[in-house]
A protein has these predicted regions:
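Aromatic-anchored segments of alpha-helical transmembrane domains
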Residues: 16-28, 86-91, 157-167, 223-228
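Short acidic/polar alpha-helix capping motifs at helix-coil junctions
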Residues: 10-18, 103-108, 119-121, 165-169, ...
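Transmembrane helix-loop-helix hairpins at the membrane interface
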Residues: 114-237
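C-terminal ends of transmembrane helices
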Residues: 58-63, 135
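Short, Lys/Arg-rich N-terminal segment immediately upstream of the first membrane anchor
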Residues: 1-8, 67-69
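Short helix-capping/hinge motifs at transmembrane helix termini and TM-loop junctions
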Residues: 29-30, 57-58, 96-97, 164, ...
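Juxtamembrane helix-loop-helix connectors linking adjacent transmembrane helices
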Residues: 32-39, 61-128, 144-145, 174-183, ...
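Alpha-helical transmembrane segments in multi-pass membrane proteins
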Residues: 5-59, 73, 77, 109-118
Length: 237
């Protein structure tokens, strides 16, 4: 992506700040205020709004990873990585040493239809597609207009890590783990670091393939298949 002229940099930075502000507000309201029933539509609408911000700021569909030219490449990479993820998760469930990592009380009481909703709609569309649009699409594209690749990836990935603070706190509460303050802080900090690193890898995948489809499929497969694995472990145990 071409860098903008110095005279336009401050305008793009303003759009970046607006996108970050939208994400921050959405993160708080989505985790603390809005009912779960509106999770998917709220995220879809926010994603569309962010794409609108990027387009107004001068980003093209190709800049966002949404162009048709690289879609086939993104699809191939995404499906290949999803297959590797599936094999890894299956091995994790089968091995006694790692099986316990899949215990998650949030899926324990799900019915078949609720599980299908989580794995086929809520996670792929409400989580994976939205977060990839936001962090590997809009933010990365706008950051690349004002800085080089490494800082752009670093900022996008750091924000992706911070994005997971509130969801991690909710997960800790639901599973009644890391009850002490120090343990909770450590768990949240660990989650931020892990997701930031994951975000950097997804950025690399996005840039390598030229398509947002690859990180979307990777993200969706990882989260959806992990949910199915957790459900299987809960039922079996």
């Amino acid at each position: 992506m071409a860098r903008v002229s110095p005279t336009l940099t401050h305008l793009v930075v303003t759009w970046i700040a607006l996108a970050i502000a939208v994400l921050a507000l959405h993160n708080v309201f989505g985790n603390e205020v809005l009912p779960d029933a509106v999770y998917v539509p709220a995220n879809v609408l926010t994603g569309v709004a962010l794409v609108g911000v990027a387009v107004v700021a001068g980003a093209s569909l190709d800049d966002l990873g949404l162009g048709r030219a690289n879609a086939g490449n993104g699809l191939r990479w995404g499906l290949a990585i999803a297959s590797v993820v599936a094999i890894g998760l299956a091995a994790g469930v089968a091995l006694p040493a790692t099986r316990g990592l899949f215990h998650d009380q949030r899926v324990a009481g799900l019915s078949g239809s609720e599980l299908a909703y989580e794995a086929l709609l809520r996670i792929p569309v409400g989580t994976a597609l939205f977060e990839e649009l936001a962090f590997r699409g809009v933010l990365l594209a706008l950051l690349l207009r004002v800085t080089s690749t490494l800082p752009a990836v670093a900022v996008s990935s750091a924000l992706f890590g911070l994005w997971h603070i509130l969801p991690t706190i909710s997960a800790l509460r639901a599973n009644e783990i890391a009850q002490g303050t120090a343990a909770a802080v450590g768990a949240v900090a660990g989650a931020v670091i892990v997701t930031a690193v994951g975000g950097a890898l997804l950025c690399a995948l996005r840039l390598h393939t030229g398509s947002l489809l690859a990180p979307v499929l990777t993200h969706a497969a990882t989260n959806s298949l992990a949910t199915l694995a957790a459900f299987a472990v809960q039922r079996a145990d």
